C-alpha cells in the first residue's frame, strides 16, 4: 500500500520529543536520519544514538489527512505555526523485491565471487559463495566485509582451520571453506546470525565443515590457523585478550569493522601478540592483519 512521509529537521536533543509528537499525530513508524550522512558507530546498550542535525521522518497511512497532522504539530512547543517540514507521497513498492533486484554478484580478489542465492553465478569455474543474508549482517557490499573477503582470497587456506569471530551471515566462514579450509568455526552473540550462517552453509554444501557457537557455548582451548573478526573497533579492543589467544603460534589474524581513524588504537591492543602488517584502507574503513608471535 502507498504511504505518506512527513520529514522534520531538528537537533539530536529534540529528536525524541518530535518523534513522540509524530506518533501522537498518527504516524505508524518513525525513522531518525542523519541530515549530513555522518557515520555513527557503537551505541551503548539501550542507547538511541542521534546526530547533531537530525531528520525525524514519520510514516502515515495514505488515507491520513495531513492538514490535520500539521495542525496538531503546530501546537507543539518545539514547532509552532508555519514550521518547516516536507510531505511526500511514497510510491507503492515491494521493498523486499527491490532490495533483491539490487543485490548482484560481486567479485573479491582473484578467485572469489559472492552471489545472491536467487541469481545465476557469473563464472561457473570461480569460487562461488551463494548467499542469502536473512536478518544477519554480511553481504559483501560493506567495505569492511569486502576487505576481509579480499584478504581471505589472498591466502592459501588449504587444510586450515578458520575462526570467524562475529560471523553474522556466515559469509567469511563459508568463503574460507570454499577457498579450501578444512574447517571453519563461526561465533556470534546473535542466535539469528547462527541460524543465517547455518542456512547459508547448507546452501553452499559446507555445513558438515562449519561449527557454530554462541559465546557461552564455544569450546575451551579453541585454536585456529586463521582468525578473522569483522565487528567494531570498541569490541575489538575490549576483546583483544580473548581474540589474541585464538590463533596458533604463527597463525594469521584479520580484523575489520574499523574506521581508519580508529586503526591506531586497535593496533595498540594487538601489537604485543602479533607482528602487524601495514594497515589497508578502503573508503573510510580499514583492515588490520598480522601473524601471531
Swiss-Prot record:
Which GO terms of the cellular component aspect does the record hold?
Answer: cytosol
Q: Where does S-adenosyl-L-methionine bind?
A: 145, 166, 188, 230
Q: Which UniProt keywords apply?
A: Cytoplasm, Methyltransferase, S-adenosyl-L-methionine, Transferase
Q: Which EC number(s) does the record attach to this protein? A: 2.1.1.-
The record lists the catalysed reaction(s) as: L-lysyl-[protein] + 3 S-adenosyl-L-methionine = N(6),N(6),N(6)-trimethyl-L-lysyl-[protein] + 3 S-adenosyl-L-homocysteine + 3 H(+)
| One GO term of the biological process aspect | methylation
Q: Which domain of life is it from?
A: Bacteria
- rRNA-binding keyword on record: no
Q: Which GO terms describe its molecular function?
A: protein-lysine N-methyltransferase activity
Q: What does this protein do?
A: Methylates ribosomal protein L11.
Q: Quote the protein name from its UniProt record.
A: Ribosomal protein L11 methyltransferase
Origin species: Shigella sonnei (strain Ss046)
What gene makes this protein? prmA
Amino acid at each position: 500500500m502507498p504511504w505518506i512521509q512527513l520529514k522534520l529537521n531538528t537537533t539530536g536533543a529534540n529528536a525524541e520529543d518530535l518523534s513522540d509528537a509524530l506518533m501522537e499525530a498518527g504516524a505508524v513508524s518513525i525513522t531518525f536520519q542523519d541530515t549530513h550522512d555522518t557515520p555513527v558507530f557503537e551505541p551503548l546498550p539501550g542507547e538511541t544514538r542521534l546526530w547533531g542535525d537530525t531528520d525525524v521522518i514519520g510514516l502515515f497511512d495514505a488515507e491520513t489527512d495531513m492538514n490535520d497532522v500539521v495542525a496538531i504539530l503546530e501546537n507543539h512547543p518545539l514547532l509552532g505555526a508555519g514550521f518547516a517540514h516536507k510531505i511526500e507521497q511514497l510510491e507503492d513498492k515491494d521493498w523486499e523485491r527491490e532490495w533483491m533486484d539490487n543485490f548482484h554478484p560481486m567479485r573479491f580478489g582473484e578467485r572469489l565471487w559472492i552471489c545472491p542465492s536467487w541469481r545465476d553465478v557469473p563464472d561457473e569455474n570461480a569460487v562461488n559463495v551463494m548467499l542469502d543474508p536473512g536478518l544477519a549482517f554480511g553481504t559483501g557490499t560493506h567495505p569492511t566485509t569486502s576487505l576481509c573477503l579480499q584478504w581471505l582470497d589472498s591466502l592459501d587456506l588449504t587444510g586450515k582451520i578458520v575462526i570467524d569471530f562475529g560471523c553474522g551471515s556466515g559469509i567469511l566462514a563459508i568463503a574460507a571453506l570454499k577457498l579450501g579450509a578444512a574447517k571453519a568455526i563461526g561465533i556470534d552473540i546473535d542466535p539469528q546470525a547462527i541460524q543465517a550462517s547455518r542456512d547459508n552453509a547448507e546452501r553452499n554444501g559446507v555445513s558438515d565443515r562449519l561449527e557454530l557457537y554462541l559465546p557461552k557455548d564455544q569450546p575451551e582451548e579453541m585454536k585456529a590457523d586463521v582468525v578473522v573478526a569483522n565487528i567494531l573497533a570498541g569490541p575489538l579492543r575490549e576483546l583483544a585478550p580473548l581474540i589474541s589467544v585464538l590463533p596458533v603460534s604463527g597463525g594469521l589474524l584479520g580484523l575489520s569493522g574499523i574506521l581508519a581513524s580508529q586503526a591506531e588504537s586497535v593496533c595498540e591492543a594487538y601489537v604485543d601478540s602479533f607482528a602487524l602488517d601495514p594497515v589497508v584502507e578502503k573508503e573510510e574503513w580499514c583492515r588490520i592483519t598480522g601473524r601471531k608471535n
